[in-house]
Amino acid sequence: MGKEKTHVNVVVIGHVDSGKSTTTGHLIYKCGGIDKRTIEKFEKEAAELGKGSFKYAWVLDKLKAERERGITIDIALWKFETPKYNVTVIDAPGHRDFIKNMITGTSQADCAILIIAGGTGEFEAGISKDGQTREHALLAFTLGVRQLIVAINKMDTTKWSQDRYNEIVKEVSGFIKKIGFNPKSVPFVPISGWHGDNMLDESTNMPWFKGWNKETKAGSKTGKTLLEAIDAIEPPVRPSDKPLRLPLQDVYKIGGIGTVPVGRVETGTIKAGMVVNFAPAAVTTEVKSVEMHHETLTEGLPGDNVGFNVKNVSVKDIRRGNVCSDSKNDPAKESASFTAQVIILNHPGQISAGYAPVLDCHTAHIACKFSELIEKIDRRSEKMEDSPKFVKSGDSAIVKMVPSKPMCVEAYTDYPPLGRFAVRDMRQTVAVGVIKAVEKVDKAGKVTKAAAKASKK
């Protein structure tokens, strides 16, 4: 057994008819998780139903249908491999689900693959002012996805036209640049998800295509196929390499043990003997022990739901929504204010400065005031407007926000799980956002005896 491949998550986005299912199905079918038995079963059913042209979308339709009926689908079916990576496909089915999943972080994508239909009229429909193509790409960027691959699909229906391909590349480069992606770092690949051209193997139908290239910090990369473009994704920084961030879900008082905060390690690691700090409570103390499922852990890793015992801290000092961090390694601090990119999803009216809804960010649930609308992008006209008077559904805006009581959040680029939030009002999610920058409060807090002793060691 060699070393296990790095895992990456990709989200496949694009207009409903762009051929997302066929393309994704093709990759999964050829490089991945569907075992031969399942495929034979599907092929037999397809033939019986007269879908003899059994193509890859059918695989996906079957998987989706089974998933919707509540049959638990072996999630391995949504995986495929490239030479370097184990890839998990995050399906972006319903628009609302997609947004919700991306925000709650059930699915943090490392890269988005934007599938564009190259056929005459189709591309224009997808990209028109209200097309999903634009909106999905804007959402992916707003939600922190910084790597993009553009696959121009259905090239077979354009008679493999180089002119059509170039026209689309030019148009798409323009709109993704407006959103914030750098087109030079985005591979563009002309494909046919149906026939398989440039999917895994170089197409013989497009001799004019000399290959894609993308510029990265590490230098430029080139390739011919969609699979190679996926293999050229920059590897994500694993959360265990970052400093500790552990948002508290609850704090218990356990007889004979003392105060036990509980929460999920989002980044970094936690272990006994560590001197931790809680923000915004500004309490510093030593971790005596770490447990998961009633067993002692030597260290808690990202994704672990742990309980840990802290000395000399009362249950009154810390609470749900506080963030635990390593006092010696970029400790978390209270946020005085922060600027965020916010997308208004469904709000019946106009939102102007002064609006103060509740924000759900990690485990914190706190009202925050939209203190200043800095700029907005109208999603239909794509116009930028500085200091707008108001924003409405469909707008994307940069907003300065001020929490109504002490809160600890982080910039999305530093600590993704602490940098995205949902805005709740009228019992629904009216907006979602990603934090760009945080103004932090420096304040001396309470240091327990245990912490003082531990830090002298």
Curated annotation (Swiss-Prot):
Region (G5): 192-194
Primary location recorded for the protein, binned into one broad class: cytoplasm
Modification type N6,N6,N6-trimethyllysine: residues: 79
Subcellular location field: Cytoplasm
Modified sites of kind N6,N6-dimethyllysine: 3, 316
GO cellular component terms, semicolon-separated: cytoplasm
Molecular function terms, GO-annotated: GTP binding; GTPase activity; translation elongation factor activity
PROSITE patterns reported for this sequence: G_TR_1, G_TR_2
Annotated stretches, region: G2: 70-74
A Pfam family reported for this protein in Swiss-Prot or TrEMBL: GTP-eEF1A_C
Keyword Cytoplasm: yes
Residues with the N,N,N-trimethylglycine modification: 2
Region annotation G3: where it falls in the sequence: 91-94
Domain tr-type G, first and last residues per copy: 5-240
UniProt: GTP binding residues: 14-21, 91-95, 153-156
Protein's UniProt keywords contain Protein biosynthesis: yes
Keywords: Cytoplasm, Elongation factor, GTP-binding, Methylation, Nucleotide-binding, Protein biosynthesis
Record's protein name: Elongation factor 1-alpha
Organism placement in taxonomy: Eukaryota, Fungi, Fungi incertae sedis, Mucoromycota, Mucoromycotina
Name of the gene encoding the protein in the UniProt record: TEF-3
